[in-house]
């Protein structure tokens, strides 16, 4: 999940008034804030799920509400996964559109390395998980895509904390990798985790989607017009059997990424001149705080609560081949996939690593990219179902993989930061960080 550029001034007509609301919005849009809130929600869920309040937590998580006639009588946890995460995927759709139309993915030669890295970090972990679970039966193999996603909120937070001395292009590489990764994850969910499709609701969903697309192309950004259209599209996609978060992506991709006289936002720049920004930027500024500050942490709170059952319960989960496959795939598979694919593609004519980077930097980043959480838990729920025999194993595997990847990647990047700092000052570089 990539946050909008905080350096760009906020266009007018923002729904948040200046003052506390605007400051809160900027705070929630920061790279580190989303990761911290996600961590707090995860820890809180784990503590409550293993406390005397565990029964209350399960009752709240399983409480069902919503209009039954529209097939929207969902549990609280399902509303978080299907509803709130649609906001997260809407922001992802905005970022995909921006990067492919006007960003770093527009130039094929520049995009080749992170695209190859993203492909490697999906293929290699999926292969490792499959190999480990070959003898566990077809049910276990349904989770092959769990280690295929990176939680960019956590990953960027780690880089922001330990990578202040690293070249800025490393963060750009991570963000570009995340954009492609999000696209692959969306495709996997749509293709492999859709049980059956009801074509009538799916065709009906094209109506609000088309109206939404026409309106935003004409520069309409009134929330009271666009939000009802988005909700209608979401409900119809949900009724079709396709995971409802795909509606969020589709809506984001419909927003124009180039500022025009009709579809753009005008504001006065620092030099007093009027400037125009694309609607993707406008919507990302408004929805990113809601995504990182509310949608993703709430989803994490209702998804990460696993009852460990003491040391014996933890040991039991860790002996499950699903958990082992997830941990090894997240930690080793992603690092091998990203670094290996990048090394291979960098040998092609016209493609090379940025001169300010070294391959040890990419290796450290590849471990940080092993931090999978939001989409990994979502795929786990789609693969096995909430409350299934593998449910706890998925959560334990994802959490341990996240922690291990963060520690290894954070340590490597901190050492690389020391190397770059010493190199910039022309000082002797300690052997431990070369």
From Swiss-Prot:
The chain crosses the membrane at residues 34-54, 74-94, 112-132, 143-163, 173-193, 196-216, 222-242, 245-265, 294-314, 326-346, 362-382, 393-413. One of its GO terms (molecular function) is sodium:proton antiporter activity. It comes from the Bacteria. One of its GO terms (cellular component) is plasma membrane. Keywords: Antiport, Cell membrane, Ion transport, Membrane, Sodium, Sodium transport, Transmembrane, Transmembrane helix, Transport. Residues 1-15 have a biased composition (Pro residues). Belongs to the NhaA Na(+)/H(+) (TC 2.A.33) antiporter family. This is Na(+)/H(+) antiporter NhaA 1. The gene is nhaA1.
């Amino acid at each position: 999940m990539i946050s909008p550029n905080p350096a760009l001034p906020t266009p007018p007509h923002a729904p948040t008034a200046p003052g506390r609301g605007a400051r809160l919005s900027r705070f929630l849009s920061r790279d580190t804030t989303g990761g911290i809130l996600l961590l707090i929600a995860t820890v809180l869920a784990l503590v409550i799920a293993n406390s005397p309040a565990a029964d209350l937590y399960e009752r709240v998580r399983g409480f069902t509400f919503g209009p039954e006639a529209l097939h929207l009588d969902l549990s609280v946890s399902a509303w978080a996964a299907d509803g709130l995460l649609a906001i997260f995927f809407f922001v992802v759709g905005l970022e995909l559109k921006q990067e492919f139309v006007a960003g770093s993915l527009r130039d094929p030669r520049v995009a080749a390395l992170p695209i190859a890295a993203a492909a490697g970090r999906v293929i290699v972990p999926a292969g490792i998980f499959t190999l480990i679970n070959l003898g566990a039966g077809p049910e276990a193999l349904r989770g092959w895509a769990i280690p295929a996603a990176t939680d960019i909120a956590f990953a960027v937070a780690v880089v922001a904390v330990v990578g202040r001395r690293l070249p800025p292009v490393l963060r750009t590489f991570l963000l570009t990798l995340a954009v492609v990764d999000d696209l692959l994850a969306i495709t996997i969910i749509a293709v492999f985790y859709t049980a059956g499709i009801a074509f009538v609701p799916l065709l009906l969903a094209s109506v609000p989607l088309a109206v939404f697309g026409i309106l935003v192309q004409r520069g309409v950004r009134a929330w009271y017009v666009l939000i009802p259209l988005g909700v209608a599209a979401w409900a119809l996609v949900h009724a079709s059997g396709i995971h409802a978060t795909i509606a969020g992506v589709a809506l984001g991709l419909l927003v124009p990424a180039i500022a025009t006289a009709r579809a753009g936002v005008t504001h006065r720049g620092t030099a007093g001149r009027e400037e125009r920004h694309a609607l993707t930027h406008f919507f990302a500024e408004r929805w990113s705080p809601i995504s990182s500050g509310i949608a993703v942490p709430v989803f994490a709170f209702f998804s990460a609560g696993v009852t460990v059952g003491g040391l014996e319960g933890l040991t039991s989960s860790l002996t499950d081949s699903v958990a082992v496959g997830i941990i090894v795939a997240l930690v080793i598979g992603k690092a091998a996939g990203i670094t290996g694919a990048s090394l291979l593609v960098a040998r092609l004519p016209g493609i090379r690593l940025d001169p300010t980077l070294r391959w040890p930097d990419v290796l450290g980043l590849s471990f940080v990219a092993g931090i999978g959480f939001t989409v990994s838990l979502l795929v786990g729920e789609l693969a096995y179902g909430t409350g299934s025999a593998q449910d706890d194993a998925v959560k334990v595997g994802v959490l341990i993989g996240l922690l291990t990847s963060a520690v290894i990647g954070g340590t490597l990047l901190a050492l690389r930061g020391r190397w770059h700092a010493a190199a910039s000052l022309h000082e002797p570089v300690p052997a431990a960080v070369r």
